[in-house]
Amino acid sequence: MAGHSYWTNTPLEALRSIRMQLKDTLDKYNVQFWQTETCIMGNDEEIGGGGGYDRTMKTALYVARIIHHDIVYAGARSWQWWRAIGGDYKDGLLREYTDPDLHDGKVEDSKLLWILGNYSRFIRPGAVRMSIKATDKSGQVIPEGDTDPQGLMCSAYQNTNGQWVMVVIHYADQEKNFTFKVDGSKVKSWQGYRTSDEA
């Protein structure tokens, strides 16, 4: 089944509950789900709605949170954005500036482009999402600890070549330390990639 994530992102409680209801229904009928289109709309008030191009992390993190919830809670097997190039709106990964005669111009990238790349570049077709559990310092499991929609959100995947990928979204302004381990598997090395307003 294909669907769109428009108008399902606010309030935060609905972001998760709508996707969990969808997943329950999909599982009942043994149907897979592809999220085939979304962009920033007027109801996305947390980031000022869809008007005005934003190349910063504000929009990028907002969309990363939607991707995380679509994959983790709705079980989306594929995820697509609305369009690649746009004008003065939050709907393009790239912002185009053209002269009136359309003979010259420039293109500017956004952090949204790079956030999407953290998924599409590293999580390859055929990858399997792995379970994650968060624990406190004493080792006690924190229910839903892998998803704090205003803090850390984590998901992990194993590609068909055996490579592991972990996507960590840090929504809060404060620094947050965490450690991770992979049970039952020997990992020789990890390579980190960071997307931020500075990098």
What are these regions (language model features)?
Residues 2-46:
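Glycoside hydrolase catalytic-domain groove-lining segments
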Residues 3-7, 36-40, 81-85, 169-171, ...:
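Active-site-proximal beta-strand/loop segments in catalytic clefts of secreted hydrolases
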Residues 13, 44, 90-92, 167, ...:
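Extended hydrophobic-aromatic, low-complexity segments
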Residues 15-24, 61-69, 147-152:
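Alpha-helical scaffolding within the catalytic cores
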Residues 23-26, 68-73, 156-157, 182-185:
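A general structural signal for short secondary-structure junctions and capping/turn motifs
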Residues 32-123, 130-137:
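Aromatic/acidic polysaccharide-binding cleft in carbohydrate-active enzymes
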Residues 138-186:
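Carbohydrate-binding surface patches
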Residues 182-199:
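Acidic, Ser/Thr/Pro-rich beta/coil linker or hinge segments at domain junctions
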